[in-house]
A protein has these predicted regions:
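HAD-like aspartate-dependent phosphatase fold
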Residues: 30-148
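Conserved alpha/beta core of the MobA/IspD/sugar-nucleotide pyrophosphorylase nucleotidyltransferase superfamily
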Residues: 1-32
Length: 148
């Protein structure tokens, strides 16, 4: 661009990371994650809208909540909570998350109660493997260990 005569203007900047190479950029990015976390059975005990324990009346899986919140406060994750709870339970769910002190960026409701598969691309700028999955036993407080 410079050789073709394009004009450039300087801008005063602060608080930026100059990686310089693709390798350095990829190393820097590895600090950051986007976590898709299922609510029931991982952050609170499993619930139902058909029978007890009902949605909104679950017990907190506090060790898992603490592990997730620590990542949230470190500022290097985006937390997207997912659930099979129907959309009509959004207000109850958001209130439950607030009551239990669960931090998050987004909530996706209404997933089918079925197998979940994450499909992601990879490239030089997002090397293989670019995605991972953790399957954990329902209602167990072992998220911190599984996240490594």
């Amino acid at each position: 661009m410079m050789l073709s005569g394009s004009h450039f203007n300087g801008l005063k900047t602060s608080n930026f990371k100059d990686c310089g190479t693709l390798e350095a950029w990829n190393k820097y990015k590895r600090q950051y994650k986007c976590l898709f976390v299922y609510i029931d059975g991982t952050l609170v005990t499993n619930s139902s809208h058909h029978f007890p324990p009902y949605i909104g009346s679950c017990k907190a899986l506090q060790e898992n909540i603490d592990a997730l919140n620590q990542l949230y406060y470190d500022g290097k994750v985006r937390i997207i909570l997912t659930t099979s709870r129907p959309e009509r339970y959004r207000d109850v769910t958001l209130e439950e998350l607030k009551e239990k002190g669960i931090e998050y960026d987004q909530v996706i409701m209404g997933l089918p109660h079925s197998r979940r598969v994450l499909i992601n691309d990879f490239a030089k700028s997002n090397p293989y493997p670019s995605a991972a999955a953790i399957n954990m036993p329902r209602n167990k407080n072992d998220l911190r260990e599984l996240l490594g």
